[in-house]
Amino acid sequence: MKKVIVISTSLRPGSNSYAMAEQFAKGAEAAGHQVELVSLRGKEIKFCIGCLSCQKTGACVIKDDVPAIMESVLNADVVCWATPIYYYEMSGQMKTLIDRMNAMYPKDYKFREVYLLTTAAENEEFVPKRAESGLTGWIDCYGKSELKGHIFCGGV
């Protein structure tokens, strides 16, 4: 059994990317895995201020909902991100969370598998490429992990 965290980054109620996140979570549960589905909707996530205190102390000085999410990511075997595509890129809230998880960088982490679920109004093959590239930049900082899959649902 693996520990799976699915992070839905859309703030819109009933969003397409949240629907994908729910289905991924249901599939993982049906396969016998322990799943935590986290929606950023309603969460307080402030911007990184670039102070780098986290690199010295191992903790971010900003008080909001990020530390709890980060702890779940650190302890997960699988991380799945779900995001709408805005201007051919991941959502701003996803990027903000990734930036804030800078405190994870020097820590031990369990995740080896990362998945990406994306949705967009446009349906062309190139639409999700920059979002994937942005996430791959984060994954590259965690050498034991890799992008195992990306599902794009366009035209929605």
What are these regions (language model features)?
Residues T9, L40, T118-A121, C153:
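Cofactor-binding loop segments of dinucleotide-utilizing enzymes, especially the Rossmann-like FAD-
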Residues K2-I5, V78, Y115-L116, I151-V156:
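A short small-residue
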Residues G92, Y105-G149:
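Short, glycine-/small-residue-rich phosphate/pyrophosphate-handling segment
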Residues M1-M104:
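N-terminal beta1-alpha1-beta2 submodule of the flavodoxin-like/Rossmannoid cofactor-binding fold
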Residues Q34-V38, K144-G154:
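Short beta-strand elements in bilobed, periplasmic/extracellular small-molecule ligand-binding domains
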Residues V79-G92, F126-L135, G154-V156:
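Short secondary-structure transition/capping segments
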